[in-house]
Protein backbone atom coordinates (compact mmCIF):
# COMPACT_ATOMS: atom_id res chain seq x y z
CA UNK A 1 0.00 0.00 0.00
CA UNK A 2 1.10 3.57 -0.53
CA UNK A 3 2.51 5.80 2.17
CA UNK A 4 0.10 6.33 5.04
CA UNK A 5 -1.93 3.16 4.45
CA UNK A 6 -2.57 0.69 7.24
CA UNK A 7 -3.34 -2.61 5.60
CA UNK A 8 -2.00 -4.96 2.95
CA UNK A 9 -0.04 -8.14 2.48
CA UNK A 10 2.91 -8.69 4.80
CA UNK A 11 6.24 -9.28 3.11
CA UNK A 12 8.68 -12.05 3.97
CA UNK A 13 10.91 -9.54 5.74
CA UNK A 14 9.48 -6.59 7.64
CA UNK A 15 11.10 -4.03 9.94
CA UNK A 16 9.43 -1.69 12.42
CA UNK A 17 10.70 1.90 12.33
CA UNK A 18 10.56 4.00 15.50
CA UNK A 19 11.71 7.59 14.96
CA UNK A 20 11.91 10.68 17.14
CA UNK A 21 9.05 12.90 15.96
CA UNK A 22 8.95 16.54 15.03
CA UNK A 23 12.37 17.07 13.43
CA UNK A 24 12.56 17.63 9.68
CA UNK A 25 15.93 15.90 9.30
CA UNK A 26 14.61 12.75 10.99
CA UNK A 27 11.54 12.72 8.76
CA UNK A 28 13.76 12.92 5.68
CA UNK A 29 16.03 10.19 7.05
CA UNK A 30 13.02 7.97 7.76
CA UNK A 31 11.80 8.37 4.18
CA UNK A 32 15.30 7.52 2.96
CA UNK A 33 15.25 4.35 5.06
CA UNK A 34 11.88 3.44 3.59
CA UNK A 35 13.15 3.82 0.02
CA UNK A 36 16.22 1.65 0.70
CA UNK A 37 14.08 -1.10 2.20
CA UNK A 38 11.54 -0.78 -0.62
CA UNK A 39 14.28 -1.41 -3.21
CA UNK A 40 15.45 -4.43 -1.22
CA UNK A 41 11.94 -5.88 -1.03
CA UNK A 42 11.74 -5.39 2.74
CA UNK A 43 8.46 -4.18 4.19
CA UNK A 44 8.48 -1.34 6.70
CA UNK A 45 6.06 -0.62 9.51
CA UNK A 46 6.05 2.88 10.96
CA UNK A 47 5.05 3.64 14.53
CA UNK A 48 2.68 6.59 14.91
CA UNK A 49 1.68 8.58 17.98
CA UNK A 50 -0.19 6.90 20.80
CA UNK A 51 -0.69 8.18 24.34
CA UNK A 52 -0.52 5.65 27.20
CA UNK A 53 -1.47 6.94 30.66
CA UNK A 54 0.84 4.43 32.41
CA UNK A 55 3.89 6.15 30.92
CA UNK A 56 5.52 9.39 31.97
CA UNK A 57 5.53 10.58 28.36
CA UNK A 58 3.70 9.44 25.23
CA UNK A 59 5.00 6.62 23.05
CA UNK A 60 5.85 9.12 20.33
CA UNK A 61 6.19 8.10 16.72
CA UNK A 62 5.98 9.60 13.28
CA UNK A 63 2.77 11.24 12.11
CA UNK A 64 1.10 9.08 9.45
CA UNK A 65 0.98 11.88 6.88
CA UNK A 66 4.77 12.26 7.05
CA UNK A 67 5.01 9.13 4.87
CA UNK A 68 2.65 10.25 2.15
CA UNK A 69 5.35 9.93 -0.51
CA UNK A 70 4.55 8.59 -3.99
CA UNK A 71 5.96 5.09 -4.50
CA UNK A 72 6.81 4.52 -0.83
CA UNK A 73 4.80 1.71 0.73
CA UNK A 74 4.63 1.45 4.50
CA UNK A 75 2.31 -0.04 7.10
CA UNK A 76 1.19 2.36 9.81
CA UNK A 77 0.93 0.84 13.31
CA UNK A 78 0.23 2.22 16.75
CA UNK A 79 2.27 1.56 19.86
CA UNK A 80 1.31 -1.58 21.75
CA UNK A 81 2.59 -5.05 22.61
CA UNK A 82 1.75 -6.35 19.12
CA UNK A 83 3.29 -3.49 17.12
CA UNK A 84 6.48 -5.41 16.29
CA UNK A 85 5.12 -8.97 16.11
CA UNK A 86 6.34 -10.72 12.97
CA UNK A 87 9.08 -8.17 12.30
CA UNK A 88 12.75 -9.03 11.87
CA UNK A 89 13.87 -6.14 14.07
CA UNK A 90 13.01 -2.67 15.36
CA UNK A 91 15.02 0.14 13.76
CA UNK A 92 15.44 3.32 15.82
CA UNK A 93 16.16 6.80 14.47
CA UNK A 94 16.84 9.15 17.37
CA UNK A 95 18.61 9.27 20.71
CA UNK A 96 18.54 7.15 23.85
CA UNK A 97 14.98 8.13 24.76
CA UNK A 98 13.68 6.90 21.42
CA UNK A 99 15.76 3.73 21.80
CA UNK A 100 14.17 2.98 25.18
CA UNK A 101 10.70 3.40 23.66
CA UNK A 102 11.63 1.00 20.88
CA UNK A 103 13.14 -1.50 23.32
CA UNK A 104 9.69 -1.95 24.91
CA UNK A 105 8.28 -3.05 21.57
CA UNK A 106 11.27 -5.22 20.67
CA UNK A 107 11.23 -7.02 24.01
CA UNK A 108 7.49 -7.69 23.75
CA UNK A 109 8.05 -9.34 20.35
CA UNK A 110 11.35 -11.08 21.31
CA UNK A 111 13.14 -9.44 18.36
CA UNK A 112 16.33 -7.33 18.26
CA UNK A 113 16.59 -3.55 18.16
CA UNK A 114 19.06 -1.46 16.14
CA UNK A 115 19.74 2.15 17.05
CA UNK A 116 20.91 4.85 14.60
CA UNK A 117 21.87 7.92 16.62
CA UNK A 118 20.24 11.15 15.52
CA UNK A 119 20.29 12.60 19.03
CA UNK A 120 23.18 13.93 21.10
CA UNK A 121 25.27 11.29 22.92
CA UNK A 122 23.13 8.33 21.89
CA UNK A 123 25.05 5.81 23.98
CA UNK A 124 22.56 3.04 23.26
CA UNK A 125 22.78 3.47 19.48
CA UNK A 126 24.90 1.06 17.48
CA UNK A 127 26.02 3.60 14.89
CA UNK A 128 25.79 7.25 13.86
CA UNK A 129 23.66 8.93 11.21
CA UNK A 130 26.62 9.45 8.86
CA UNK A 131 26.98 5.66 8.59
CA UNK A 132 23.29 5.09 7.83
CA UNK A 133 23.71 3.67 4.31
CA UNK A 134 26.40 1.24 5.44
CA UNK A 135 24.31 0.10 8.41
CA UNK A 136 21.20 -0.44 6.30
CA UNK A 137 23.25 -2.37 3.76
CA UNK A 138 24.32 -4.76 6.51
CA UNK A 139 20.70 -5.16 7.58
CA UNK A 140 19.60 -5.88 4.01
CA UNK A 141 22.36 -8.51 3.66
CA UNK A 142 21.70 -9.86 7.18
CA UNK A 143 25.31 -9.12 8.11
CA UNK A 144 24.73 -8.53 11.79
CA UNK A 145 24.84 -10.44 15.04
CA UNK A 146 22.57 -10.33 18.07
CA UNK A 147 23.77 -9.62 21.59
CA UNK A 148 21.57 -10.23 24.63
CA UNK A 149 21.47 -7.46 27.25
CA UNK A 150 20.15 -8.26 30.69
CA UNK A 151 17.09 -6.47 32.05
CA UNK A 152 15.49 -6.00 35.45
CA UNK A 153 12.19 -7.37 36.74
CA UNK A 154 10.72 -5.08 39.38
CA UNK A 155 7.86 -5.57 41.81
CA UNK A 156 6.41 -3.67 44.76
CA UNK A 157 5.02 -5.47 47.81
CA UNK A 158 2.80 -4.18 50.59
CA UNK A 159 2.33 -6.67 53.44
CA UNK A 160 3.48 -9.51 51.14
CA UNK A 161 0.89 -8.57 48.51
CA UNK A 162 2.30 -7.66 45.10
CA UNK A 163 0.71 -4.35 44.05
CA UNK A 164 2.93 -3.33 41.11
CA UNK A 165 5.14 -5.00 38.49
CA UNK A 166 7.49 -3.55 35.91
CA UNK A 167 10.74 -4.04 34.05
CA UNK A 168 13.71 -1.95 32.95
CA UNK A 169 16.60 -2.10 30.53
CA UNK A 170 18.69 0.65 32.14
CA UNK A 171 17.58 1.12 35.72
CA UNK A 172 14.85 1.15 38.33
CA UNK A 173 15.01 4.44 40.22
CA UNK A 174 13.37 4.55 43.65
CA UNK A 175 12.59 8.15 44.56
CA UNK A 176 10.70 10.30 47.04
CA UNK A 177 7.30 11.06 45.54
CA UNK A 178 7.10 14.62 46.84
CA UNK A 179 10.83 15.34 46.41
CA UNK A 180 10.58 17.14 49.75
CA UNK A 181 12.42 15.77 52.75
CA UNK A 182 14.39 12.54 52.87
CA UNK A 183 13.30 9.05 51.84
CA UNK A 184 14.17 6.62 54.65
CA UNK A 185 15.08 3.17 53.34
CA UNK A 186 16.69 -0.11 54.32
CA UNK A 187 18.78 -1.87 51.67
CA UNK A 188 18.73 -5.66 51.53
CA UNK A 189 20.83 -8.00 49.37
CA UNK A 190 20.00 -11.70 49.08
CA UNK A 191 17.77 -11.69 52.13
CA UNK A 192 20.23 -9.89 54.43
CA UNK A 193 20.09 -6.25 55.59
CA UNK A 194 23.05 -4.17 54.39
CA UNK A 195 22.40 -0.57 55.44
CA UNK A 196 19.66 1.82 56.52
CA UNK A 197 19.90 5.46 55.44
CA UNK A 198 18.05 8.54 54.34
CA UNK A 199 18.45 9.53 50.71
CA UNK A 200 16.94 11.19 47.68
CA UNK A 201 16.62 7.76 46.14
CA UNK A 202 18.24 4.45 45.20
CA UNK A 203 19.12 3.33 41.68
CA UNK A 204 19.31 -0.33 40.73
CA UNK A 205 20.95 -0.65 37.35
CA UNK A 206 22.08 -3.12 34.71
CA UNK A 207 25.53 -2.88 33.09
CA UNK A 208 23.79 -1.28 30.10
CA UNK A 209 22.36 1.37 32.42
CA UNK A 210 25.71 2.04 34.08
CA UNK A 211 26.40 4.81 31.52
CA UNK A 212 23.00 6.44 32.11
CA UNK A 213 21.35 7.72 35.32
CA UNK A 214 23.54 5.52 37.54
CA UNK A 215 26.63 7.13 36.00
CA UNK A 216 25.30 10.61 36.83
CA UNK A 217 24.66 9.47 40.41
CA UNK A 218 28.29 8.39 40.87
CA UNK A 219 28.06 4.72 39.95
CA UNK A 220 30.78 2.79 38.12
CA UNK A 221 30.86 2.12 34.39
CA UNK A 222 30.39 -1.63 33.89
CA UNK A 223 31.30 -3.33 30.62
CA UNK A 224 28.14 -4.80 29.04
CA UNK A 225 29.78 -8.23 28.70
CA UNK A 226 29.81 -8.43 32.51
CA UNK A 227 26.52 -9.54 34.01
CA UNK A 228 25.85 -7.87 37.35
CA UNK A 229 23.41 -5.73 39.30
CA UNK A 230 24.44 -2.24 40.42
CA UNK A 231 23.05 -0.48 43.49
CA UNK A 232 23.71 3.28 43.58
CA UNK A 233 22.32 5.41 46.44
CA UNK A 234 21.48 8.98 45.43
CA UNK A 235 22.57 11.72 47.86
CA UNK A 236 22.50 9.32 50.79
CA UNK A 237 22.92 10.64 54.34
CA UNK A 238 25.12 7.86 55.71
CA UNK A 239 28.77 6.98 56.26
CA UNK A 240 28.34 3.77 54.26
CA UNK A 241 26.28 4.44 51.18
CA UNK A 242 28.66 3.47 48.42
CA UNK A 243 27.74 2.00 45.03
CA UNK A 244 27.58 -1.80 45.15
CA UNK A 245 28.07 -4.38 42.40
CA UNK A 246 26.35 -7.70 43.12
CA UNK A 247 25.85 -11.04 41.43
CA UNK A 248 23.39 -11.00 38.51
CA UNK A 249 21.45 -13.66 40.44
CA UNK A 250 21.08 -11.49 43.56
CA UNK A 251 17.75 -10.28 44.86
CA UNK A 252 17.98 -6.58 45.70
CA UNK A 253 15.29 -5.22 48.00
CA UNK A 254 14.70 -1.66 49.19
CA UNK A 255 12.21 -1.20 52.02
CA UNK A 256 10.78 2.23 52.73
CA UNK A 257 10.31 2.96 56.41
CA UNK A 258 6.71 3.03 57.62
CA UNK A 259 5.73 6.61 58.39
CA UNK A 260 8.26 7.93 55.89
CA UNK A 261 7.33 9.53 52.57
CA UNK A 262 5.51 7.79 49.75
CA UNK A 263 7.73 7.07 46.79
CA UNK A 264 7.71 6.18 43.13
CA UNK A 265 9.71 3.67 41.11
CA UNK A 266 10.73 4.94 37.67
CA UNK A 267 11.59 2.18 35.20
CA UNK A 268 13.94 3.62 32.56
CA UNK A 269 12.45 7.03 33.36
CA UNK A 270 9.39 6.00 31.32
CA UNK A 271 7.12 3.76 33.38
CA UNK A 272 6.10 4.45 36.97
CA UNK A 273 5.17 2.15 39.85
CA UNK A 274 3.48 3.38 43.03
CA UNK A 275 5.50 2.96 46.24
CA UNK A 276 3.48 3.64 49.42
CA UNK A 277 5.34 4.35 52.65
CA UNK A 278 6.28 1.04 54.29
CA UNK A 279 6.30 -0.83 50.97
CA UNK A 280 9.09 -3.00 49.63
CA UNK A 281 10.68 -2.96 46.16
CA UNK A 282 12.28 -6.17 44.89
CA UNK A 283 14.54 -6.23 41.84
CA UNK A 284 15.99 -9.30 40.15
CA UNK A 285 17.52 -10.12 36.82
CA UNK A 286 14.84 -9.97 34.13
CA UNK A 287 13.55 -13.16 32.55
CA UNK A 288 13.41 -11.56 29.09
CA UNK A 289 16.55 -9.82 27.75
CA UNK A 290 16.65 -7.06 25.18
CA UNK A 291 18.23 -8.29 21.97
CA UNK A 292 20.77 -5.87 20.54
CA UNK A 293 21.80 -5.68 16.89
CA UNK A 294 25.58 -5.44 16.59
CA UNK A 295 27.12 -4.38 13.28
CA UNK A 296 30.78 -4.51 14.27
CA UNK A 297 33.05 -5.86 16.99
CA UNK A 298 34.51 -2.55 18.20
CA UNK A 299 35.60 -2.75 21.87
CA UNK A 300 33.38 -1.11 24.47
CA UNK A 301 36.32 1.07 25.52
CA UNK A 302 36.41 2.64 22.05
CA UNK A 303 32.68 3.32 22.18
CA UNK A 304 32.97 4.91 25.62
CA UNK A 305 35.87 7.15 24.56
CA UNK A 306 33.99 8.25 21.45
CA UNK A 307 30.64 8.89 23.11
CA UNK A 308 32.03 10.74 26.12
CA UNK A 309 34.80 12.42 24.09
CA UNK A 310 37.39 11.25 26.62
CA UNK A 311 40.98 12.52 26.26
CA UNK A 312 43.46 9.77 25.35
CA UNK A 313 46.38 11.94 24.24
CA UNK A 314 49.69 10.40 25.32
CA UNK A 315 48.54 6.78 25.11
CA UNK A 316 51.32 4.65 23.64
CA UNK A 317 49.88 1.15 23.95
CA UNK A 318 51.76 -2.10 24.39
CA UNK A 319 54.36 -2.85 21.74
CA UNK A 320 53.81 -6.13 19.83
From Swiss-Prot:
NCBIfam families: PRK03372.1. One of its GO terms (biological process) is NADP biosynthetic process. The gene is nadK. It catalyses: NAD(+) + ATP = ADP + NADP(+) + H(+). Keywords: ATP-binding, Cytoplasm, Kinase, NAD, NADP, Nucleotide-binding, Transferase. The keyword Kinase applies. NAD(+) binds at residues 96-97, 101, 170-171, 200, 211-216. Transmembrane segments: none annotated. GO terms for cellular component: cytoplasm. Coiled coil: none annotated. Its cofactor is a divalent metal cation. It comes from Rhodococcus opacus (strain B4). This is NAD kinase. Involved in the regulation of the intracellular balance of NAD and NADP, and is a key enzyme in the biosynthesis of NADP. Catalyzes specifically the phosphorylation on 2'-hydroxyl of the adenosine moiety of NAD to yield NADP. It comes from the Bacteria. The keyword NAD applies. The active site is at residue 96. Signal peptide: none annotated. Its main location: cytoplasm. SUPFAM superfamilies: NAD kinase/diacylglycerol kinase-like (SSF111331). InterPro entries: ATP-NAD_kinase_N, ATP-NAD_kinase_PpnK-typ_C, NAD/diacylglycerol_kinase_sf, NADK. Its EC number is 2.7.1.23. Belongs to the NAD kinase family. It is found in: Cytoplasm.
